[in-house]
Amino acid sequence: VEWTDAERSAIIALWGKLNPDELGPEALARCLIVYPWTQRFFASYGNLSSPAAIMGNPKVAAHGRTVEGGLMRAIKDMDNIKATYAPLSVMHSEKLHVDPDNFRLLADCITVCAAMKFGPSGFSPNVQEAWQKFLSVVVNALKRQYH
């Protein structure tokens, strides 16, 4: 993947404004609420019976922060995302048996949450374009083991 200077700047600037203690948990909770079939991969997390239960679930929040940590690693090494995510791809494919389409669903929820936080001025079409390109590269890296 080739990144323009403008794309790199937009992604890094947006990331610098995000609070990983908020975005990750919020995006994962949104994914579990909006796409309830994704909950089957989180059965060990306890009460996921309602949106309020999901939003208040500490295990969901903790895993959301883990997701954000993974994104941080990708941002720090944007030219090597496939290698960065290779072990995660193997784990999600071979150990956890996660449906690879769920990565895209979560990426969409991350985008929605970022857009809601920053609004049209902070999440302009140019920023969105760069951010979605970045998340698409991450999703494809996570799906790599499935092919």
UniProtKB/Swiss-Prot annotation:
Going by the UniProt record, its keywords in alphabetical order are: Heme, Iron, Metal-binding, Oxygen transport, Transport
What PANTHER family does the entry give?
HEMOGLOBIN FAMILY MEMBER (PTHR11442), HEMOGLOBIN SUBUNIT BETA-1-RELATED (PTHR11442:SF102)
Q: Could you identify this protein by its name?
A: Hemoglobin subunit beta-A/B
Q: Where does heme b bind?
A: 63, 92
Q: What does this protein do?
A: Involved in oxygen transport from gills to the various peripheral tissues.
Give the family per the record. Answer: Belongs to the globin family.
| InterPro entries from the UniProt entry | Globin, Globin-like_sf, Globin/Proto, Hemoglobin_b, Hemoglobin_oxygen_transport
| Organism, as annotated | Cyprinus carpio
Q: What CDD domains does this protein map onto?
A: Hb-beta-like (cd08925)
Effect of changing residue 143 to C: reported as: In beta-B chain
On assembly, the entry states: Heterotetramer of two alpha chains and two beta chains.
- Give the superkingdom in one word: Eukaryota
Q: Name one GO cellular component term.
A: blood microparticle
Q: Does the keyword Phosphoprotein apply?
A: no
Q: Name one Pfam family in it.
A: Globin
